[in-house]
Amino acid sequence: IAWVFGVNGKNFIKTMLRIGKERGAASVVDDQIGSPTYTYDLARLLVDMIQTDKYGRYHATNEGLCSWYEFACEIFRAAGIDVKVTPVHSDEYPAAKAKRPMNSRMSKEKLTENGFERLPEWKDAVARYLKEITW
């Protein structure tokens, strides 16, 4: 799993919404790519998995790829918030607490090969998530 967001706890979406409200602008790295993962969708997949004998190691994220910058832009678009989002390179972003991989995409072929339904598109997941939270 990667780039996880859900109703409980802190996550990138909640952080972006807070920054967007407080500042009206955000600087977000545009050179790291991956796939966001909604905990609700992941939980559905895990329930499906435990009802089988298809054990093993799987990669599971919502479908599609984006950069953190594209993720932030979609969050604000889906939330209907007008925020100026500025793309920056990782080496220009001093606030990073941990080094992140430039490419965290994962192959999810094993899911399909074993008959599991892949998680929905990440943009769809963001839209559904925003309906679930109070912000």
Q: Locations of the language-model features?
A:
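Conserved C-terminal active-site "lid" loop/helix of NAD(P)H-dependent oxidoreductases
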Residues: 67-73, 90-134
